[in-house]
């Protein structure tokens, strides 16, 4: 029986020259599944990502956060989802260029050349943009002295390990899914949880809101509404008080040693924005039947792509990955007919 090595291909930091069928920019869930779909069609691909590991936001920001809308998984953490996707693409042994940004893209369909910030050159017949939020970073609250508390870890924008907050008094600021989800996830771990939002109404999934109301009623979290962040108190990076205020100027002091502001991510497409692609509010517009952009041979999938009716769901990114892969096949093999087959019939190409 053939043994499959599930260790990921090595990603050298030395500049490389790679000739391949498809360059995938972005190694989050959509990019990884695109690699699988291309591999199933016997197409070669290379994964390129600015982060030092694959997984995108799932791995970098939310490895322990449960995801509830992946088919066949009642709940799966972001980290476990990425591990499963890596196992799925392991048989194809696709190279990875990590800790790099794509700086330039030249050429036309069938003959693209990409260069990276590490000096790599990639020649590809087609390009798949699975860049998620682009080069993402948190929207930071405008508070005096914020940098010192960021440096000490008293102010954090991502939760990588829930255990890091055991026994701590935590202020969570924000009114969206991330704020609500982490308030629920830190129950039973943090000693005290305050949730600060400038409005009384939160914007999150209905089931999550119902759980938040139950948690507040049970005293597991305290909802501090309608308040917004006003100031931080402490010394030498050690946080002791988070000040919040109403629009009328009423100030309240919350004793806490950690602040988690969840005000979303700022999106920066970087050089991608200069490639002549049709953009709509920092997203790339595509033909939803093929996931192709206005530039022939360049496709976009996942959160970076937009079209009427688009849902920013991981599972939709998976669907877009499959459509893009099938649309790319005739670009790479124009004289070869592609007959659609189910994986139950074909198996995984060896």
Swiss-Prot record:
Residues recorded as binding FAD, renumbered to this chain, are 49, 57, 62, 102, 136, 303, 344
Q: Which UniProt keywords apply?
A: FAD, Flavoprotein, NADP, Oxidoreductase
Q: What is the name listed in the Swiss-Prot or TrEMBL entry for this protein?
A: Ferredoxin--NADP reductase
Query: What reaction(s) does this enzyme catalyze?
Result: 2 reduced [2Fe-2S]-[ferredoxin] + NADP(+) + H(+) = 2 oxidized [2Fe-2S]-[ferredoxin] + NADPH
Q: Which organism is it from?
A: Granulibacter bethesdensis (strain ATCC BAA-1260 / CGDNIH1)
- Note on cofactor: Binds 1 FAD per subunit.
Which PANTHER family would you find in this protein's record?
THIOREDOXIN REDUCTASE 1-RELATED-RELATED
Q: What is its EC number?
A: 1.18.1.2
Cofactor list: FAD
């Amino acid at each position: 029986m053939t043994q499959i090595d599930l260790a990921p291909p090595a990603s050298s930091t030395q500049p490389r020259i790679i000739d391949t069928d498809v360059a995938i920019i972005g190694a989050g869930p959509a990019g990884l599944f695109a690699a699988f779909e291309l591999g199933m069609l016997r197409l070669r691909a290379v994964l390129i990502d600015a982060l030092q590991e694959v997984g995108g936001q799932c791995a970098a920001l939310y490895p322990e956060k449960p995801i509830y809308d992946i088919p066949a998984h009642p709940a799966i953490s972001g980290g476990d989802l990425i591990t499963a996707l890596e196992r799925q693409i392991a048989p194809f042994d696709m190279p990875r260029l990590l800790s790099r940004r794509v700086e330039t893209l030249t050429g036309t369909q069938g003959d693209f050349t990409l260069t990276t910030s590490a000096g790599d050159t990639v020649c590809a017949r087609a390009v798949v943009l699975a860049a998620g939020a682009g080069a993402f970073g948190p929207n930071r609250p405008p508070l005096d002295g914020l940098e010192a508390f960021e440096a000490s870890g008293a102010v954090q924008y991502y939760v990588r390990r829930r255990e890091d907050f055991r026994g701590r008094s935590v202020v969570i600021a924000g009114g969206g899914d991330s704020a609500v989800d982490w308030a629920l996830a830190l129950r039973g771990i943090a000693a005290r949880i305050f949730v600060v939002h400038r409005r009384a109404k939160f914007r999150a999934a209905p089931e999550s809101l119902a759980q938040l109301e139950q948690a507040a009623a049970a005293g597991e979290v305290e909802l501090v509404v309608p308040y917004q962040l006003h100031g931080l108190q402490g010394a030498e990076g050690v946080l002791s008080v988070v000040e919040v205020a109403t629009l009328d100027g009423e100030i309240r002091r919350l004793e806490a040693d950690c602040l988690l502001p969840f005000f979303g991510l700022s999106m920066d497409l970087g050089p991608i924005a200069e490639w002549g692609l049709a953009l709509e509010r920092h997203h790339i517009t595509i033909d939803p039947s093929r996931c192709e952009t206005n530039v022939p041979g360049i496709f976009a999938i996942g959160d970076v792509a937009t079209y009427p009716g688009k849902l920013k769901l991981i599972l939709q990114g998976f669907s877009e990955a499959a459509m893009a892969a099938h649309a790319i096949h005739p670009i790479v093999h124009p004289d070869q007919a592609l007959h659609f087959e189910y994986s139950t019939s074909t198996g995984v190409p060896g």
